[in-house]
């Protein structure tokens, strides 16, 4: 079975790891009163969100130049269509959410990126901040559902179909 390239695999797993970090960062931030600790955790969340956005842009650029391997034989048109739809929606959300996050965080102030550089903010616009927050929250729940669907599809291929689909996104195994 053909595999994704090493770069595609690395970007996939780095994106997954960044998502696993940025979600708890905002949950932690919400549990602190306004102050420097809360600001730190929000900055970490925002910086990871920007990182996810950059990784998704790199993934899409790489994917445009390097086609994905085909699905295992017998996958079926419905399953392939569902996989394509899920991947497309995941990419879309992972591009939209950092933008809405920036529209919230940069609304009246600069947005620090890992305290290395500041992304320029823009003049405060109350309505824009409220709209961006609403879209961000709705996308958050859609993202949870799509991640669950993505993982469930992988488990189905590994445990039920046993068709080697997961191995496409893993480095080759060397014999011991």
What does each of the following model-derived ranges do?
Residues 1-176:
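Membrane-embedded alpha-helical bundles that constitute the cytochrome b-like, heme-associated redox core
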């Amino acid at each position: 079975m053909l595999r994704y390239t090493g770069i595609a695999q690395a970007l996939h797993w780095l994106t997954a790891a960044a998502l696993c970090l940025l979600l708890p960062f905002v949950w932690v931030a919400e549990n602190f009163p306004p102050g420097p600790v809360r600001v730190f955790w929000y900055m970490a969340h925002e910086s990871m969100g920007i990182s996810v956005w950059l990784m998704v842009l790199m993934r899409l650029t790489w994917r445009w130049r390097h086609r994905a391997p085909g699905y295992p034989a017998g996958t079926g048109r419905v399953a392939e269509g569902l996989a394509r739809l899920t991947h497309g929606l995941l990419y879309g959300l992972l591009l939209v959410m950092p933008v809405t996050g920036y529209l919230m965080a940069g609304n009246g102030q600069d947005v620090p990126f890992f305290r290395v550089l500041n992304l320029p903010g823009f003049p405060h616009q109350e309505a824009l901040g409220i709209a961006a927050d609403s879209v961000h929250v709705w996308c958050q729940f859609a993202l949870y559902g799509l991640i669950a669907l993505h993982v469930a599809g992988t488990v189905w291929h590994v445990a039920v179909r046993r068709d080697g689909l997961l191995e496409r996104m893993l480095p080759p195994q060397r014999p011991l």
